From Swiss-Prot:
Name recorded for this polypeptide: Nitrile hydratase subunit alpha
Modified-residue entries (Cysteine sulfenic acid (-SOH)), positions: 110
Chain positions found as Cysteine sulfinic acid (-SO2H): 108
InterPro entries assigned: CN_Hdrase_a/SCN_Hdrase_g_sf (IPR036648), CN_Hdrtase_a/SCN_Hdrlase_g (IPR004232), CN_Hdrtase_asu/SCN_Hdrlase_gsu (IPR023900), Nitrile_hydratase_asu (IPR018141)
Keyword Cell inner membrane part of the UniProt annotation: no
Protein modification: Oxidation on Cys-108 is essential for the activity.
Gene assigned in the entry: nthA
Free-text comment on the cofactor: Binds 1 Fe(3+) ion per subunit.
Co-factor(s): Fe(3+)
Family stated for the protein in its record: Belongs to the nitrile hydratase subunit alpha family.
Amino acid sequence: MSTSISTTATPSTPGERAWALFQVLKSKELIPEGYVEQLTQLMAHDWSPENGARVVAKAWVDPQFRALLLKDGTAACAQFGYTGPQGEYIVALEDTPGVKNVIVCSLCSCTNWPVLGLPPEWYKGFEFRARLVREGRTVLRELGTELPSDTVIKVWDTSAESRYLVLPQRPEGSEHMSEEQLQQLVTKDVLIGVALPRVG
């Protein structure tokens, strides 16, 4: 007896698989109404490195806020409304003249979404995740950041308990700049710790 059932797998795109999974979960009422739309809004518009730039610039000009940020990063970011998934346990890492902090997620690609936005592609790559821990200075140099030989590089591995944000040193030449202008110096790479804020 012949059969018309094919034993050859039909390839599907990740988008098609995600849509099929979504439909199954929705049909079983396992996804709250509006959840996906809300998450899409957060990812597309609300989670952004500009949020982190506002936090850093505020810390540069406001000593009380800086102290709060270093004591309780979650509470400090919440003052701006930067909360939500991956932002429950925010820890600010303060750069000093002798210490440069860098963030990595050695197991996957977790970041502090509400303040850093979604991770860049290179951050998710195995090479970056594996090499940064072993040869941080070399990796930073390859990414365009040259540090003095006596600077200690501290690599912080993101976990379920901690989501990090680098608080860089305020750059020389920025003394005359307003808080809004200072925000423009802080990029996603600066917040991750692989770049330095620069004036001009």
